[in-house]
Regions:
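A sequence/structural signal for flexible, mid-protein segments enriched
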Residues: 127-226
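Extracellular beta-sheet/turn segments enriched in Thr/Pro/Gly and aliphatic residues
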Residues: 118-162, 263-323
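C-terminal motif of bacterial Sec signal peptides marking the signal peptidase cleavage site
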Residues: 12-15
Length: 323
């Protein structure tokens, strides 16, 4: 199986038709719509969040054929469709949002080309293995299998999932005392920097995330109403969180190098699912929510009070026996 002449000539096009007008166009293909509604709002945010798009086309044997690119204002149009002129046959499409932008934080391990196969496709976070203190550019993934018949353009939708997370950690003293972020070292560790074609993670060695921003903020008054509360915060940007990975959040007190907390991060995030989103699977929940906020409460000696935390504005009671 081959692509029509125009695709065989063009290795990187935003659409098949409209270029090489002297060549006979295909008479069939697909028109693809792209949707990102795999989120907690269940609303399509593709046009507001995806600023560049790459669509890889493979034949039914998994042989690479061509890459299509979409960029700029065309993606903001809710009527945007990507038109592909294809010969009759079965195809596998893999879409990446945010991968081909100038500010991308991810790239292909090897750029797909003629002779490459789908099973070898790999996407890796930049500077994997080094401490990451970057606000990662959002990355999205989607895939679709479909067939093309003679003389028809099939309409289809590629549904995307977001692979990047923003995690905000807040330290607050229970009695309302000031907490200074400079007194603590915040880290997240995981192994989540290398993606397979199906968006699953491939072990790539440990990854350390440091905050891309941190500081102090006054958030209100104490329960008595007589004092403002100054908290410390640290904000992380990470790759995909996967249930079963040994993802950990550690906070160390710099004065004596003692660990204030060392917790299995994903399990703590899933405490919120248990209480409020129990109908969702663990991985569905982690993939649907991409903006996290966790508040930990400290005593006067800056030790963690292990009774409850606040996750995304919900109070979650802690039972250590469950973790």
């Amino acid at each position: 199986m081959v692509l029509c002449t125009v695709l065989a000539v063009a290795a990187l096009l935003s659409s098949c038709h409209g270029i090489y007008n002297d060549l006979e166009p295909c008479s069939q293909g697909v028109r693809l719509r792209f949707v990102y509604d795999y989120n907690m709002e269940y609303a399509n945010a593709f046009h507001s969040q995806v600023d560049c798009l790459a669509l890889l086309v493979y034949d039914e044997q998994g042989n690479y054929l061509v890459t299509y690119i979409g960029t700029g204002d065309e993606l903001k149009d809710e009527n945007y469709r990507m038109t592909l002129d294809l010969e009759k046959g079965s195809y596998h499409f893999i879409a990446y949002g945010g991968l081909t932008c100038p500010k991308t934080s991810f790239s292909f391990k090897a750029v797909p080309g003629i002779g490459s196969i789908m099973q070898d496709l790999r996407v890796e976070m930049h500077n994997a293995g080094r401490v990451s203190e970057t606000d990662l550019h959002p990355l999205f993934h989607g895939s679709l299998d479909m067939s093309v018949d003679n003389g028809a353009y099939e309409e289809a939708t590629v549904y995307l999932m977001k692979n990047t997370n923003n995690i905000r950690v807040v330290l607050q003293q229970m009695n309302g005392g000031e907490v200074d972020d400079k007194n603590f070292t915040f880290r997240i560790t995981d192994d989540n920097t290398l993606f397979a074609p199906d968006n699953s993670l491939i072990s790539n060695g440990g990854q350390v995330y440091a905050p891309w921003t941190q500081g102090q903020r006054t958030v209100g008054v104490t329960e008595e109403g007589d004092e403002t509360v100054t908290v410390a915060y640290a904000e992380f940007s990470t790759s995909r969180l996967v249930a079963g990975n040994h993802t950990r959040l550690t906070i160390t007190r710099n004065s004596d190098n003692a660990q204030v907390l060392n917790i299995p991060l994903n399990e703590y995030l899933l405490l919120l699912k248990s209480d409020h989103f129990d109908k969702m699977g663990d991985q569905e929940f982690l993939d649907s929510e991409n903006n996290w906020s966790l508040i930990f409460f400290l005593d006067n000696n800056h030790n963690w009070i292990r009774t409850h935390i606040v996750v995304n504005d919900w109070i979650v009671r802690i039972n250590d026996a469950e973790l």
